[in-house]
Amino acid sequence: MNTLNETAAADESLDTAFLSSPQCAAPQRFQKIKRKSRASPETERKKPKSTIGKQGENPSATEPRYGGNSNRFGLLAHLTADKQVGNEIGDLYDQPSTSHQAAIAAAKRDAASAGTTSSAKRAQSKPPPIVMEGVDDVYLMMQSIENIVDLEKIEARASMSGVLRLYAADANTFRTIVNWLEIEEYEFHCYQLKEDRPYRVCVKGLHHSTLHHQIKDELEKIGHKVLDIHTPLRRNEPGTSKASPVNMFFLNIAAAANNKEILAVKALCHMRVVIEPLRKRNAIVQCHRCQQIGHTAKYCRKAHICVKCAGEHPAKDCTRPRIELCTCYNCGGQHPANYKGCSKLQAFLQRSRPRSGVAGRTEVSDRPTPRGLAGGKEIPSSRGGISYADVARGSIHHKQPMSLTHQQQKQKQQPYDGSPSRQRSRSRTRASRGTLQRSTDASSSIEAILQTLNENINSLRSIQEKQMELMMMMMKQQQQQSHQQGQIINLLTALQARQAP
């Protein structure tokens, strides 16, 4: 009994020492102490043997029973207290220490900073290439560029056609190279950075007489910075001398996180409006400066090329008369450089179209086509409407078969030659190949017809050119005749003046 009391007192002292220690939340120390504290109830459960009712023993009347306590449930109270202490220790174990909380906070900050960095990298797109033509010495140019930027941030690539492309690693390097090339007066063209592209919208329902600064001021009040405003013009209609403006505005707004909020604007300048994102044009762009295809004049630093005569001057300075034929800079044909039917433009369009498959390729399978499936049609049932009762009665022979397809009728009319099914399928495959050969011959004949048409068109063009030359010659002859007539009239006038008294 004394041993039991000493054990309980030792357990209480251990619990008190554990709770007062600063490392109570450490996992390893807690596990060791927890095993020690859990060992005490097992010792307490070993109750001493009862001496009640035994002869020869005279227990003291003043000594309490049941472990030194008059209450028979005293030991259970100690066990309950021990469980409460264990729960408190478990709660302390669940709560991390101060150093552990600091480590978790630091890890969260690192993860947040890593996420921000990755999102910033995603937002910053790869710069477009800088395209140059006619570079004589790339090594000297790279040596000059090395003075302003690190060459590790530049990648150059030369094509077989003599075009040099410079690829910058980031936007700052791209802008630095472009500014340096402009200062050194190199001929090149580039493209707009993706991060500099504005958000373009179309404002419908606003009268064309609305002043641009009014639209700009109202949109800036609600947090949208307007970069440019354009009013489209309607094409010349019959009976009108000039194009008329449309009640519509195209707006370029600076890129921001709230760009799409402008679509919710329903009133502008005291008028009801509808704002929509501007639709993308699928047309191929052409530079109005150098007349080349694939870029715009805003980012072109090449020499000016005339759209009419292909000379090295702007179109506004061209002196070629309207009566003369134009010369295309791209293909050399007798049409303006911006003609939509230009062969160079059509070839560019053909290259830019996505390829869905190899044109002109027809697959021929050795596996025979099942009867009735040619052209994707289902096989009609020739014994449709037959029930089990009809078969049982034997009236199936009185049923009239449904109409056969044209192919089945043709096969039915052909006599069976005794050849196996594989041989018959091969014969059908040969027939399909013959059909393919006939279709190939038809396509070749169509190509020949188209070629003859092109030749006829070229001959007509040459005839028109000759007619134009004849007209020019006739005009010159008329001018000479009028000049001669004027000289004759002057001579007659002079003679009459001399003959007069």
Curated annotation (Swiss-Prot):
Chain spans, region Disordered: 20-71, 105-128, 353-385, 400-443
GO aspect biological process, one term: DNA transposition
Organism: Drosophila melanogaster
ZnF (CCHC-type) residues: 285-302
Subcellular location: Virion
Top-rank lineage group of the source organism: Eukaryota
Record function comment: Strongly basic protein that binds directly to retroviral RNA and may be involved in its packaging and in the reverse transcription process.
Protein name (database record): Nucleic-acid-binding protein from transposon X-element
Entries under SMART domains matching the protein: PRE_C2HC
Coiled coil: none
